Protein backbone atom coordinates (compact mmCIF):
# COMPACT_ATOMS: atom_id res chain seq x y z
CA UNK A 1 0.00 0.00 0.00
CA UNK A 2 1.22 3.49 -0.86
CA UNK A 3 1.62 5.76 2.17
CA UNK A 4 3.34 9.00 3.13
CA UNK A 5 4.97 10.57 6.14
CA UNK A 6 6.73 13.73 7.24
CA UNK A 7 10.49 13.29 7.64
CA UNK A 8 10.57 14.32 11.32
CA UNK A 9 7.82 11.81 12.13
CA UNK A 10 9.81 9.13 10.37
CA UNK A 11 12.90 10.00 12.40
CA UNK A 12 11.21 8.83 15.59
CA UNK A 13 8.75 11.52 16.57
CA UNK A 14 5.54 10.02 15.25
CA UNK A 15 4.88 7.59 12.44
CA UNK A 16 6.14 4.10 13.09
CA UNK A 17 7.27 2.63 9.80
CA UNK A 18 7.68 -1.15 9.75
CA UNK A 19 11.25 -2.25 9.10
CA UNK A 20 10.18 -4.23 6.04
CA UNK A 21 8.43 -1.25 4.42
CA UNK A 22 10.08 0.31 1.39
CA UNK A 23 11.06 3.93 2.08
CA UNK A 24 11.33 6.49 -0.73
CA UNK A 25 12.77 9.89 0.13
CA UNK A 26 11.20 12.44 -2.21
CA UNK A 27 13.24 15.43 -1.06
CA UNK A 28 15.47 17.54 -3.28
CA UNK A 29 18.17 17.41 -0.57
CA UNK A 30 18.29 13.63 -1.12
CA UNK A 31 18.73 14.06 -4.88
CA UNK A 32 15.33 12.57 -5.60
CA UNK A 33 13.92 12.64 -9.12
CA UNK A 34 10.51 12.84 -7.41
CA UNK A 35 11.21 16.19 -5.74
CA UNK A 36 10.19 19.58 -7.12
CA UNK A 37 12.85 21.67 -8.83
CA UNK A 38 14.57 24.28 -6.69
CA UNK A 39 12.89 26.98 -8.81
CA UNK A 40 9.41 25.56 -8.19
CA UNK A 41 10.11 25.07 -4.50
CA UNK A 42 11.36 28.66 -4.13
CA UNK A 43 8.32 30.05 -5.98
CA UNK A 44 6.00 28.12 -3.66
CA UNK A 45 7.82 29.03 -0.47
CA UNK A 46 7.96 32.72 -1.45
CA UNK A 47 4.20 32.59 -2.20
CA UNK A 48 4.73 33.70 -5.82
CA UNK A 49 2.39 30.90 -6.93
CA UNK A 50 -0.73 29.32 -5.48
CA UNK A 51 -1.28 25.63 -4.78
CA UNK A 52 -3.07 24.98 -8.08
CA UNK A 53 -0.17 26.40 -10.10
CA UNK A 54 2.30 24.48 -7.94
CA UNK A 55 0.47 21.21 -8.63
CA UNK A 56 0.36 21.83 -12.37
CA UNK A 57 4.02 22.77 -12.61
CA UNK A 58 5.08 19.86 -10.41
CA UNK A 59 3.10 17.34 -12.50
CA UNK A 60 4.70 18.75 -15.66
CA UNK A 61 8.18 18.44 -14.15
CA UNK A 62 7.59 14.84 -13.12
CA UNK A 63 5.97 13.77 -16.38
CA UNK A 64 8.83 15.28 -18.40
CA UNK A 65 11.39 13.17 -16.51
CA UNK A 66 12.04 9.63 -17.73
CA UNK A 67 13.73 8.85 -14.41
CA UNK A 68 10.75 10.06 -12.37
CA UNK A 69 8.26 8.08 -14.46
CA UNK A 70 10.39 4.94 -14.10
CA UNK A 71 10.63 5.37 -10.32
CA UNK A 72 6.87 5.91 -10.04
CA UNK A 73 6.20 2.68 -11.94
CA UNK A 74 8.54 0.83 -9.58
CA UNK A 75 6.79 2.35 -6.55
CA UNK A 76 3.40 1.29 -7.95
CA UNK A 77 4.68 -2.27 -8.44
CA UNK A 78 6.22 -2.46 -4.94
CA UNK A 79 3.07 -1.04 -3.32
CA UNK A 80 1.03 -4.00 -4.58
CA UNK A 81 3.07 -6.38 -2.40
CA UNK A 82 3.81 -4.23 0.65
CA UNK A 83 3.91 -0.80 2.21
CA UNK A 84 5.80 1.96 0.42
CA UNK A 85 6.28 5.26 2.26
CA UNK A 86 6.96 8.52 0.45
CA UNK A 87 8.98 10.64 2.88
CA UNK A 88 9.45 14.41 2.64
CA UNK A 89 10.36 17.29 4.91
CA UNK A 90 7.32 19.41 3.96
CA UNK A 91 4.84 19.95 6.77
CA UNK A 92 1.35 18.49 6.32
CA UNK A 93 -0.34 21.90 6.22
CA UNK A 94 -3.59 21.17 4.35
CA UNK A 95 -1.83 18.35 2.46
CA UNK A 96 0.20 20.95 0.54
CA UNK A 97 3.17 18.74 -0.19
CA UNK A 98 4.23 17.11 -3.43
CA UNK A 99 4.08 13.66 -1.82
CA UNK A 100 0.27 13.89 -1.96
CA UNK A 101 0.47 14.82 -5.65
CA UNK A 102 2.79 11.86 -6.20
CA UNK A 103 0.44 9.46 -4.45
CA UNK A 104 -2.34 10.60 -6.76
CA UNK A 105 -0.14 10.33 -9.85
CA UNK A 106 1.16 6.88 -8.92
CA UNK A 107 -2.34 5.63 -8.13
CA UNK A 108 -3.44 6.63 -11.63
CA UNK A 109 -0.68 4.67 -13.38
Model-inferred region functions:
Residues 1-109:
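Residues lining hydrophobic/aromatic ligand-binding pockets adjacent to catalytic sites
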Amino acid sequence: MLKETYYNQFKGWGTEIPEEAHKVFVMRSHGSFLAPSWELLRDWQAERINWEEYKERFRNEILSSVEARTIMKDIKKRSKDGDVYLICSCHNKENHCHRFILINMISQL
